[in-house]
Amino acid sequence: MKEVIDTVGRRKTSVARVFMSPGKGKIVVNKLPVEEYFKDEFKRSQALKPLVTAEKQDEFDIKVNVKGGGLTGQSGAVCLAIARALVEFDESIRPTLRTERLLTRDPRMVERKKYGKKKARKSFQFSKR
């Protein structure tokens, strides 16, 4: 059994690298406590959802390096990375996380802007007369 599990999670343009080791439940994101980094309760709960689902909140110390994108993308990336680390630690958790869709990379990306339009789909104002 490896002492430190190293996994990567991605969401939108964010990339999270998680280093998970057995411990007392200390979670650090970019050298800040998780409560300070993800101040919004929803984003924090989304990032830590795999631990709650697997009921392993106090069993691991987790160090996260996350870069790129905004807080929503970053919390999604952290979520996927933690889920992958849990599966690497204990394969029996996989079905539980799979049913909660925590092991699936969200493929949705920002749609590119098209020429002749204001944004990806929004057109300029059209006047018939």
Curated annotation (Swiss-Prot):
Annotated InterPro entries: Ribosomal_Su5_D2-typ_SF, Ribosomal_uS9, Ribosomal_uS9_bac/plastid, Ribosomal_uS9_CS, Ribsml_uS5_D2-typ_fold_subgr
Chain ranges passing through the membrane: none
GO biological process: translation
Chain intervals with Basic residues compositional bias: 114-129
Disordered as annotated region, ranges: 110-129
GO cellular component: cytoplasm; small ribosomal subunit
Pfam families listed in its UniProt record: Ribosomal_S9
Swiss-Prot/TrEMBL keywords: Ribonucleoprotein, Ribosomal protein
PROSITE patterns in the record: RIBOSOMAL_S9
GO molecular function: RNA binding; structural constituent of ribosome
Family recorded in the similarity comment: Belongs to the universal ribosomal protein uS9 family.
NCBIfam families: PRK00132.1
Name this protein carries in UniProt: Small ribosomal subunit protein uS9
Biological classification of the source: Bacteria, Pseudomonadati, Chlorobiota, Chlorobiia, Chlorobiales
